[in-house]
Amino acid sequence: MSGHSKFANIAHKKAANDAAKGKIFTRLGKELMIAVKEGGPDVNNNSKLRQVVAKCKAANMPNDTIDRAIKKAASNDMSNYESVTYEGYGPNGTAIIVEALTDNRNRAASNIRSAFTKGGGNVGTPGCVSFMFDNKGQMIVDKEEYTGDADELMMLALDAGADDFNEEEDCYEILTSPEEFDAVNQALADAGVTFASAEVTMIPQTTVDLTSEDDIKKMNRILGLLDEDDDVQNVYHNWNEPEEDEE
């Protein structure tokens, strides 16, 4: 699942034990299926599918696994699955968006509401927190994987249509509009750049600090329960999570 900040995805994509990878691949497989359902199996004519494929490749999903998932989705009836988004609040007014892909809306709603409640939060009305986030294409390039010149990478990204380029201690972040994500991702991939993550995501405009141990425990409780929920695909939040608390 996606995290709170611009660079949180690196921790998830590097995670690494087989169980974590299996869970990530399962979620990505569902995203592939819903993208095929919505726009067909031809990646050249389905922009949503192209975005999910880029996300899969950044997560190191094998190409044959991606191809099998697309073919399976094209041959199966996915009409019983639907995408549902929930918005709500965690401790100290933190904003949380939950994207679910489920074949049972009632089950998903019940489990997600329970996760919020157990962490001292609550599910709100549609739109109650989404205005606090920007929908952006985001690519993270790990400095351990890319040893070239930062200025060259920046110019390559900007020339391809990126909106912004940020450098952190261990990675570079490239931001695009959702519409330009495909073009920028392809241009960088063609230049041999590999990604720690690459996806269209929700990025918080500002972040919230949690200073009390109780609030931190409650927030981790919410996020942990959502992470365990098979219906949940992505979680976005604006908690300025301390680095040592990331996995």
From Swiss-Prot:
Presence of the UniProt keyword Cytoplasm in the record: yes
Keyword presence, DNA-binding: yes
Alphabetic keyword roster: Cytoplasm, DNA-binding, Transcription, Transcription regulation
Pfam families: TACO1_YebC_N (PF20772), Transcrip_reg (PF01709)
Xref: InterPro entries: Integrase-like_N (IPR017856), TACO1_YebC-like_2nd/3rd_dom (IPR048300), TACO1_YebC_N (IPR049083), Transcrip_reg_TACO1-like (IPR002876), Transcrip_reg_TACO1-like_dom3 (IPR026564), YebC-like (IPR029072)
Subcellular location: Cytoplasm
GO CC aspect terms: cytosol
GO molecular function, one term: DNA binding
A Gene Ontology BP annotation from the UniProt entry: regulation of DNA-templated transcription
HAMAP family attached to this UniProt entry: Transcrip_reg_TACO1
PANTHER family documented for this protein: TRANSCRIPTIONAL REGULATORY PROTEIN YEBC-RELATED, TRANSLATIONAL ACTIVATOR OF CYTOCHROME C OXIDASE 1
Family note: Belongs to the TACO1 family.
Name of the featured protein: Probable transcriptional regulatory protein EUBELI_00902
Organism encoding this protein: Lachnospira eligens (strain ATCC 27750 / DSM 3376 / VPI C15-48 / C15-B4) (Eubacterium eligens)
